[in-house]
C-alpha cells in the first residue's frame, strides 16, 4: 500500500478497546459507554471519518457533520450520504482532500479491525479509550507496540451513570 495521505494530514485511529483487546461482538460494540460516545463525537466532528463496511452497517447511518468514507470489498455496496470505495489508498486520498477542504489537519479512522490493522503502520496518533472490562467478543484492536507508540496524554474516569465500566483515555503518539 502506498502512503496516500501526506504527513501534513494526520491519520488518527479512534477506538474504544476493552482490557482484553475486544472492540466488537456480532458487529456491535461489546459495551455501553455513553461518556465515550461524547468523546468520540468531539474527536471526529468536522473531520472525514474512514471506516469499513461492517463498521458503517453497525452504526446504521452516516455520522452527521462528517464526511463518511466507507471501504468495502463488496462492489455493489452503496448508501446515501457516504463515499464508498474498494481501495484503501483511494479512500485516504478522498479523506485527505476532504480534510483540506474543511480546513482540518486530520482524518479519523474509526474501524473496524481490518482497517485499524491496515492503517496502524501509517497512523500518526491513536486516541484510545481503554475500557476496564473484559467482554466476550469476536473483533480485536491490533496490539499497541510500546516500541512504536508512547502515551502523551492520559486521564482516568470512573463509570458514569450510563457507562458499564471505568475508562482511561489515552492519546498515543509515535515513539
What residue spans do the PLM features occupy?
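Enzymes that bind and transform nitrogen-containing heteroaromatic metabolites
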Residues: 2-175
Amino acid at each position: 500500500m502506498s502512503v496516500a495521505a501526506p504527513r501534513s494530514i494526520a491519520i488518527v485511529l479512534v477506538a474504544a478497546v476493552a482490557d482484553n483487546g475486544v472492540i466488537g461482538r456480532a458487529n456491535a460494540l461489546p459495551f455501553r459507554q455513553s461518556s465515550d460516545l461524547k468523546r468520540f463525537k468531539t474527536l471526529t466532528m468536522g473531520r472525514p471519518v474512514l471506516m469499513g463496511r461492517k463498521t458503517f452497517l453497525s452504526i446504521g447511518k452516516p455520522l452527521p457533520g462528517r464526511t463518511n468514507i466507507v471501504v468495502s470489498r463488496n462492489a455493489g455496496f452503496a448508501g446515501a450520504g457516504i463515499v464508498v470505495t474498494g481501495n484503501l489508498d483511494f479512500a485516504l486520498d478522498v479523506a485527505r482532500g476532504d480534510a483540506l477542504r474543511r480546513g482540518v489537519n486530520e482524518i479519523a479512522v474509526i474501524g473496524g479491525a481490518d482497517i485499524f490493522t491496515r492503517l496502524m503502520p501509517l497512523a500518526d496518533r491513536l486516541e484510545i479509550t481503554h475500557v476496564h472490562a473484559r467482554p466476550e467478543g469476536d473483533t480485536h484492536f491490533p496490539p499497541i507496540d510500546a516500541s512504536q507508540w508512547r502515551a502523551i496524554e492520559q486521564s482516568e474516569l470512573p463509570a458514569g451513570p450510563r457507562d458499564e465500566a471505568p475508562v482511561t483515555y489515552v492519546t498515543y503518539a509515535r515513539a
